[in-house]
Structure formats: C-alpha cells, structure tokens
Amino acid sequence: SYFGNFKPNNKQKREIYLLFPEPILLNRSVRANFLFTLKTYGIKEDIEERIKESLMFLNLDESLLSKHPNELSSGQSQKIAFAIALSVRAKYYLLDEPSAFLDKNTTLLFKKAILKMHENFNTGFLIASHDKHFLDSLAQKKLYLHSGEILEFENTNVFELENQGVKFCNFIDFSNCKKYKDF
C-alpha cells in the first residue's frame, strides 16, 4: 500500500490526492472526468466553480470540457489531469514528477497553480521530482533520498506551509520523519 503499515479510513484517503506523471483519464468527456473524480471524493457542492477555477489556474479553455482524451494533445491531457486534481481541493497532494514532459510555460503554470492552491486553500504538497529547478522555486523543505534513505534535509523557506509537513508525516506514519522534528 502507498501508506505502509498505516491503514487510513475513507475520510483520510479523501484528504490526499495522488497525481502520477502520466495522465490517467477515463474514455469520456473531460467534463465527465471532472464529475467522476469529484463524485468519488464525495464533493457535491460548488462543482461548476471548482471546474472553472481549476481550468483557469492552468489557462485551459472551457471548450475542452466537451472533448474526449483521444482529442487532446499529450500536453493538454497532462494539464487536464492536474486541473482535475486541483478541483478536488485535497488537504494534501502527492505529486510524482509533475514537471516531467512539460515545456517551460506549462511548468510555470503548474508552479503558479501549486502556489495559488496553497495560498487559497492552505493545501500541502509533497512532490517527488528529479527536476531541481522546479523544486527550488516551490519547496519550503526538501528531503534528498537515495535507495529509500534520507541523504540530506534542506530548509529553503520559500513559503510557509504552517507545519503541513509534520501533519503529513504523522498522517502517513513515515518513521524517518521523526529524525526531522522541524519538518
């Protein structure tokens, strides 16, 4: 399991959104993908507002809502998958290589969206990435891992996460996080 020995209940699972590097979209309209995800997370209010806002964060036109995944470019698919994730307004996001395969403009849009989500909804992000430049402009705290071991811990203080890292470590029971009381 993604959570190790910790067994989160359904409410706790809905507080986390995991976004993979390859977009995962159902073979239905973009709007239907949004609606399916929001329903899965138990979200029943402000649906249209959430969809419009997440599209706006990534400079996506609402005309894409009627398209199917096979009608989208790979870049559009990646943006749509991220927009769907943002529409959930999860408490925590696990982003696996979010800048992989992105051009510079889209990478900048993703950075701005992450910062906006944190600013507007106090959302925490745990980002796994080999893209140091992407992380340098976003991360308050960085852990460098090799073969599952923490090699280095760095506090960059780009923006204040109000101890979201500590809450997240406790939430998923990372035993290594205990080494870093200030994380």
What residue spans do the PLM features occupy?
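Conserved ABC ATPase signature
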Residues: 68-72, 76
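Conserved signature/switch motifs of ABC ATPase nucleotide-binding domains
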Residues: 88-90
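Conserved beta-strand-loop-alpha-helix hinge in the C-terminal portion
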Residues: 149-172
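Hydrophobic anchor residue at the start of the ABC signature
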Residues: 82-84
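Conserved catalytic motifs of ABC-family nucleotide-binding domains
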Residues: 22-32
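Conserved ABC ATPase "signature" region
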Residues: 46-63
